[in-house]
Every structure is written in structure tokens, then in C-alpha cells.
Amino acid sequence: MSARQSPASRAPRIYAHAATSIDLESYRAYKGPRLPYQAERALLLAQPGDLVCVDEPVDPSFLEFLSRLGLGPLPEHLVVGDRCASGDFVLAEKLRHDDATLLSMAASLPKHRVVYLDPFIGTSYEEQLVRALQTRCGVQVIMDAPRAAIVERYNRKHEVRQLAAALGLPIADGEVVALDGPPDHTPRDITPLESAIERALSKTAHVIVRACESAGGSGTFLVDRNTGSLESTLAEVAKRRDNRFYLVEERVAASVSPNVMLHIPLPPEPIRCIGVTDQVLDEGLVHKGNRFPTTTRCADAIERDALRLGRVMRDEGYRGFAGIDFIECEPPRSSRSQHLFIELNPRVNGAFYPLSTRARLNEMQDRRGQPTINAFVSRSLPTQPISFEALAASTRDLLFDPERGSGVLPYKTGGFEFGFVTAISLAASPEEAERLLLAFASRLPARRALE
């Protein structure tokens, strides 16, 4: 089987990994103009026969680069949403409202076979797209994600925290705060949140406040005693219209923050752990990348807790991917758990793309008798705006080479024009992966030091 062939038994997939489906005002503002380009990530997942839907055209030179590695869809299977549609439309809406695009998608899919819609997150937008493909195009489509109502339930961090505690998963000390006010309006009074933070600060010097419906770090606030961070946090919360519940917890010092990626299928198939990675977080605890393999000493316990949560989710009708965050606590904690459950993302997350890319590449490496990829580190790197062609020209000797079984694979190329290069460094060892990424970062135009 060549690198560009797909197993005949594999059902075709329609990838629609647009983060615009996350309908949170603060998240959209946080991501800014880069948000429509997030759907590009699914190019790493697609195989021949799959469709990849994006909001914006993709650089042809990047598609060619992926093709040489045996990754990505066929060029004719890249579906660009209607660029004349309202800017308020999410990708799934653009596709659903464009009959020509729907019919073109249907024509690219095999007849009389089930097709899976693989979204970034399952929402009502994706559910409506499935119905449109079924009723208007006659395509047998199943959404490989939980129903929107189930996603909404598991997006509420305070409810998931309560579930985790009921299952016996270790959680940080803290409380849930409810703010008064009508939906989609700023809170009437933030005094309850202020009081909760002050109570927490009377017991510990470091507190974390998290909006209970948030994504990508857009709702995370760090409050330290005697720094003015309490006032700035309250001022920011007072402006927000998309949350009424906040978690106020002790900010426990962590040696590492592992993420467990699960796939939860319908029974009787077993729940699978796709992989455990260490999150790369900035000083504000915002996700910037992932490392594999994990360095946590608690890997077995963390995976066991994740699977326990996954089984309950499946019993409640959950089907699809889920990312579960933990921290490994810095010692000494002799009388307490060495790890804590932090939160659940009822969708794929940033770790999924490098994990899947490593698995795909290793399948091809194995068939060709080439070196196995044992480690990776992914990172979002600040730079000056740059094109993919210019980036490839300046880093060609560092890009992934199947013969070596190592190198750097840039992706999410739409973000390059905004001064962010996202890349996966793959290698035989974690040390080599870090070395390659540092070398790659040093060639970026801004030449900023990589932390």
C-alpha cells in the first residue's frame, strides 16, 4: 500500500474542525483573527477519500508538502466554505446554506456507504449540517461526536467537577460561585466572586479562577495575594456576558500537567486511551503545545481516573473524543493525592493533532522499514508574519524526513500571517525533539528565545 492509499474498509470522513463552533464571546475575542484558520488542523488527520472543510483557502505549497509525507486529503477534496457568507456564520452554517457546496461534497463521497462527520466539537451547527447532507443530498452521515446537549452538559466545568468528586477523583480545594443576572448580559453584582476569592486567599497565597464555560484559556484568571490581580480579575469578569458560574480554587504547584485523550465509542467497543501528553503552558496557564511521552510519575493513576470518568460519560450517551486535564502535584504531599483532576474538554483538543500525526507517520514508517517516531513536542511559536514557502526554504534541513524518522512539521499555516507558527517536532527521543524545535525556532524571522 502506498503512502497515499487508504484502507478500503475505512469509512470516509468529513472533517470540519472549525473552532468557530465554540459559541463563546470571550473565546472568539481571545482568538481574534486567527480563529477562522483553526479548521486547517484537520489536514493532518485526513486520508485519501476524506473531505476536509475549511473557512479559508489553504496554501497549495503546504498541501504539496503534506502530500509528500503521505498526509492530507486529495486536493479536490478540500472544501472551502462560502467566503461571501455572513461573518457571523460558523463553518458548518456556511456549508449548510450553500447548495452547490453540499452537492459537490456529496458527489465526492461514495454512494451506499456510511460517512462520518468528524467535527472539532459537536454542536447544533454540526447536527444541522448532518441533516442537510442526509435530506438534501441523500448521504448516509453519522456524526462522530456526542450530541450537542451532551456536549453542553460536559462543557460546564462546575458540573464536571461535581461528577469527578462523586467518582472519587481528587480535586483541588475550592468552591463554585454563581453570579446573578440575565443570560447574555454582564453580571449585576460580582461581590459573591470577590468574597469567594478573598476566602481562598485567606488560606493560600495563590488562587485560580475559571469561568465554567470557557475554552483555550480564555476564562482562566490567576490571583495572587497582594499583587493587584484580584482587582484586575474582577474588572474583567464584570465585562463578560457569557458566564454566570465561576470556579475558585487553590492553585496547587504542579510539576507537570498531563492530558489524557480518550475515544469513547458506542458499546461494546472498549474506550481507548489515544495517548497521555504533558501540556506546555505559559505563565498564565494557557495551552501552547504538548510533549510526548509524558513524564508524570502518576501516569497509571491518571489514566485509570480518566477511564473511570469516560465510562460514566458513555453511560450518559457520550460518543466521540474527550480530553481530560490533570496536574501532578509538586512534592511533598505525603497525606494527599499526588495528582488532581482539573477539567474535561468534550471534544478533540490540541494534543490530538500531534498524537494522530505521529500514529499516521509511524504506520508508514513501519511499512517502509524506516525509523520509529517515539517522541514529539508541539508548540506555538511567535514570529514575524511569514509564508509557508519562505519558512520551508529557511528550515528545509530541519523539516520532517521519513528516512531519518525525525524533523519538524509546521501546520495551521493560516496563522503564519498573524505572527504565529505552530509546529510538531518528531524524533526518536524527547531530547532530540526539543533540540530540533529549538533549532527550528532560532530560524524564525523574529529570532525570539524559546522558553
Protein language model regions, located:
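A long amphipathic alpha-helix within ATP-dependent nucleotide-binding catalytic cores
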Residues: 241-245, 250-251, 274, 284-336, ...
